[in-house]
Amino acid sequence: MTEISDILLRTILDSRGNPTVEAEISTISGGFGRACAPSGASTGIYEAKVRPCDEAVADAYINLIPKLIELDSADQRGFDDTLHEVDGTSDLSGIGANIAVALSLANAKAAASTLNMELYQYLGGAFISQTPLPLGNVIGGGAHAVDATDIQEFLIVPTGASTAAEAVFTNALVHKRIKEILIARGKGCGKGDEGGWAPHIADLEAFEIVNEATTKVFDETGIEVRMGLDVAASEMWDAASGRYVYKNAKRTTEEQIAYIADLTEKYNLIYVEDPIQEEDFEGFARITEEVSGRDTLICGDDLFVTNASRLEEGIRNDACNCVLIKPNQIGTLTDTFETISLAHDYGYETVMSHRSGETTDNTIAHLATAFGCCFMKSGVVGGERIAKLNELIRIEEHF
């Protein structure tokens, strides 16, 4: 019933106008799954490797697809094991991580469709009853914008929202209020890759603006909205000098830790992603300890790249208390699930995330719900972002 009967691959556009891979899988009983590979602008050095799309698709039709036809789509681990076997490398550079993630997710969706189940139900089971809160980028800089803030993402999460719909609309309202504040201050209102505003302002002013906007929204709605950051510190790190290079400062690791800890206290940050460069497990452990008296999540993205082996090293070093989950970093749903399971076993929170180069694929809303992630990081506005946010609203209607 769940046997794979047909697989199609194609090259499509992502939100930055770059090519990416889309996969479609059909089963003999009429099940169907479609999924797309996203891409990042600031990528970790340990991420699985992508291949040029047209070349990877052509190779897959010759060397990979024939070995997937007639597999049981309900055997996700078996499907993903076949991807690894054909690939033959440790980083998916053989078939390409973009091919692997599109096929792996499409396979799970095809199996769920065959069984007439929603993907989150198929993966998460009968007792799933809660969606994650949306974590959204409202001011962007770093690798996502030109001549904007040093910190890559100024984030918000509506901790006071009682439903997914309320949370999604609250984040959108903060985004609107930020535009109004920027206009009032005479600042430009361009947007970065993920839909956050990308004004030519310093980090300090960005903090002030987001704080003002969240206060306005609380006064209007009574819903508390907390701030977070994606520092993307690896993008600032200069190994030659041993400094984190900002526009107006160069900080040692000690100074970076003190700076982030001060921001966390001053702005009551609920979430700080990649405050330290991706090779420094000790630095991550020190900042995690520094803020341990607060409810702040110190999240590893480039540090862990959704890789269970990297996470095991983090656990040994007491680095972080949260893991960012990006399926395309590791390439398959099975590997993604294993990293999430390991994180939860050791008390780490997990955050399911989009990439800066996205499509209208909404799969991560289902994964975030099925796997018990506390947040879904997916932007606030833009068609490729709201596709995921609106899916959260739809999913919650089933509870």
From Swiss-Prot:
Primary enzyme class: lyase
Molecular function via GO: magnesium ion binding; phosphopyruvate hydratase activity
Reaction(s) the record says it catalyses: (2R)-2-phosphoglycerate = phosphoenolpyruvate + H2O
Entry cofactors: Mg(2+)
Record: residues binding Mg(2+): 230, 273, 301
Keywords per UniProt: Cytoplasm, Glycolysis, Lyase, Magnesium, Metal-binding, Secreted
A GO cellular component entry from the record: cell surface
Entry's Gene Ontology BP terms: glycolytic process
SMART domains xrefs: Enolase_C, Enolase_N
PANTHER family: ENOLASE
Function comment: Catalyzes the reversible conversion of 2-phosphoglycerate (2-PG) into phosphoenolpyruvate (PEP). It is essential for the degradation of carbohydrates via glycolysis.
Name of this chain's protein: Enolase
Organism: Methanocorpusculum labreanum (strain ATCC 43576 / DSM 4855 / Z)
